């Protein structure tokens, strides 16, 4: 498959959703970065898109239109049925068993148990999104939190626990979306080369982190347009990761320029170079209540008394109390045992470059086949 930088407008089945999904991804990423400028950010935009598209099956009227248009879909060009079929296919492709990839993603709706759920809605979210709506007693808030946490812990085999720490006050309808990802590098790092090194958080803060190292031929670019350098590292399977090192103090400049066009330009401009590469070993995670970010992006009706969710339940005015998203990304040395450590085509003519991710950096992970943005991350302090 072409890289995510290929022609993203192509309407082949797994890619029909890509333009809208990628545009939504960068909009959401920028909202969250601007709301927490000094914090790590880790989101899985494609799984948030999937969750909101699923929710639209229960919406009617303006609420439904606003949800789908807010996700970037032009409803005159793409019929609604095609959107849900596209996500159904995407969910199937991303969820196919790839032994080299540990990835668990999913959505669930928790609905106050006093409301009667429409069977047609349950059937639709099961069919298209392999999801379910669960009755919850929100009057007993500690127990409701426990139910949601246990549900997600079970679904992720314990990889994601305690999503619901510190959330309180009454609710009627909560949309939960989660993803855990740990890929296998096509060209692994040698664990014996990992050493504690300094990471410069800012001018006054330095922390020690385990720093992975490899010297190999990788796709590299010193961007002539934006103040950054980057490498593209492939996972076994369809995953590919861009590690972007902005010049000192230029993180915000690079984030502001992230777009489909930028990714396409990078993909065309990267060339194989021999690089001494240092990347922190870390587990990066983010937990978000997305109400503020979505409202700022024009997806606001669902949280207000204007909401129309008559396709979920016909009892009563119903609005969404919270949209929760939890993403966990593990970066470690491991590669496929069967992969020979050769890297890309050898270019012995070039002097080796050193690229050291020892200050705040960005990471973008795409699924190459579907052009889905699996993860967008900003790493201020590797954890």
From Swiss-Prot:
Primary location class: secreted
InterPro entries with a match to the protein in the record: Serpin_CS, Serpin_dom, Serpin_fam, Serpin_sf, Serpin_sf_1, Serpin_sf_2
One matching Pfam family: Serpin
Tissue specificity comment: Produced and secreted by hepatocytes, but has also been identified in a number of glycocorticoid responsive cells (it is found in maternal lung, spleen, and ovary and fetal kidney).
Carbohydrate-modified residues: 74, 154, 238, 308
Keywords: Glycoprotein, Lipid-binding, Secreted, Steroid-binding, Transport
Similarity annotation: Belongs to the serpin family.
Protein name: Corticosteroid-binding globulin
